[in-house]
């Protein structure tokens, strides 16, 4: 038994037994996590079983597994595939005739990180859609362009919905007091032709005023862009970060008109950074909005224009594989906020 446990899990027999107790020893858990990070499949299977627990430890382990799966935490190169396959096996067990009504498996019958990882692994479309229904429920598009159909949940070319982007960016703001992020909006109302950015700015100023770094996520019809109002040398500036083709002049003018409400008097105080970063990140405009908010929240007093321009220029030097990995990992990290 000693030899078997040690060879499979790199744990002593007492350490292994402690994993099934009420209080798992910190030493045993640390050793197990280390093996998981190195890609030990047996330890991954064991940690996924621990993640089924409905206590603090179970939630902690489930979060750790998702961090490895989404690239937020580093592990072996194929760690995400090993984890989601382990979750898929658990999902199959959870749905057999013996265990399907067992409450110990409830994380695989309701929205959870474990269920999301299992769904990403299955190749059976009907099962994939069934899992997506459990995760997403009934969602409705707020614009004609939003793709909220459940069959698209794991698609690497899916446009982020307003709710997904809001959940993720609000989650980021809670971690950083330097930014204020508003709920995502369309730029122009489809029927009244009202400039919604202007309306949101007026409401924000009336209610609480603009913060030193105020972010608006704006959809121009089928594309998300980031609009930042910030103070530089006591002067209000506006930065538009657009990761696809250059905006047309009408759209730019609508943004400039809205910016005047924030106190910007000259059009040259609205800075447009426009670079196509999406060749290998299809429909990834929302991903870049999320990522740039991360960058801005960590930029301190640095000039936002410099921060975002340097990021865009560096991103274009990445290989196709690195850009594709950014697409996969960022989508996973964003959707995690909708699972909480």
Curated annotation (Swiss-Prot):
Catalytic site: 223, 285
Alphabetically ordered keywords of this record: Host cytoplasm, Hydrolase, Protease, Secreted, Thiol protease, Virulence
Source organism, top-level taxon: Bacteria
Main localization category: secreted
Known role: Effector proteins function to alter host cell physiology and promote bacterial survival in host tissues. This protease targets the host cell ubiquitin pathway by acting as a deubiquitinase in infected host cells.
Subcellular location: Secreted; Host cytoplasm
Record carries keyword Protease: yes
Alphabetized InterPro entries for the sequence: ElaD/SseL-like_N (IPR054329), SseL-like_C (IPR054328)
GO CC annotation terms, alphabetical: extracellular region; host cell cytoplasm
EC id: 3.4.22.-
Biological-process GO terms, alphabetical: proteolysis
Pfam families found in the cross-reference section: ElaD-SseL-like_C, ElaD_SseL-like_N
Protein name stated in the entry: Deubiquitinase SseL
Organism (species): Salmonella paratyphi B (strain ATCC BAA-1250 / SPB7)
Molecular-function GO terms, alphabetical: cysteine-type peptidase activity
Family: Belongs to the peptidase C79 family.
Enzyme class, UniProt record, top EC level: hydrolase
């Amino acid at each position: 038994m000693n030899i078997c446990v040690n060879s499979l899990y790199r744990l002593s027999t007492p350490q292994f037994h402690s994993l099934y107790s009420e209080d798992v020893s910190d030493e045993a858990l640390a050793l197990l996590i280390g093996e998981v990070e190195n890609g030990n499949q047996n330890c991954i299977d064991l940690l996924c079983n621990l993640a089924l627990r409905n206590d603090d430890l179970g939630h902690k382990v489930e979060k750790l597994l998702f961090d490895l799966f989404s690239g937020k935490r580093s592990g072996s190169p194929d760690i995400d595939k090993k984890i989601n396959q382990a979750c898929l096996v658990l999902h199959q067990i959870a749905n057999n005739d013996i265990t399907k009504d067992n409450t110990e498996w409830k994380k695989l019958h309701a929205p959870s990180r474990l269920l999301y990882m299992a769904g990403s692994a299955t190749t059976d479309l009907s099962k994939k859609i069934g899992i997506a229904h459990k995760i997403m429920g009934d969602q409705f598009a707020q614009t004609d362009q939003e793709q909220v159909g459940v069959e698209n949940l794991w698609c690497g070319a899916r446009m982020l919905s307003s709710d997904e982007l809001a959940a993720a960016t609000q989650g980021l703001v809670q971690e950083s007091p330097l930014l204020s992020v508003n709920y995502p909006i369309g730029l122009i109302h489809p029927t009244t032709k009202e400039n919604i950015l202007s309306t949101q700015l007026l409401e924000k100023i009336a209610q609480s005023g603009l913060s030193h770094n105020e972010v608006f996520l704006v959809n121009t019809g089928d594309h998300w862009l980031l609009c930042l109002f910030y103070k530089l040398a006591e002067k209000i500036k506006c930065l538009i970060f657009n990761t696809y083709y250059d905006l047309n002049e009408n759209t730019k003018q609508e943004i400039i008109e809205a910016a005047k409400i924030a106190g910007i008097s000259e059009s040259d105080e609205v800075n447009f950074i426009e670079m196509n970063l999406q060749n290998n990140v299809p429909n990834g405009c929302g991903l870049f909005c999320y990522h740039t908010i991360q960058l801005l929240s960590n930029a301190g007093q640095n000039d936002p224009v410099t921060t975002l321009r340097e990021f865009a220029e560096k991103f274009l030097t990445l290989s196709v594989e690195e850009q594709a990995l950014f697409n996969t990992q960022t989508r996973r990290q964003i959707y995690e906020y909708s699972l909480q």
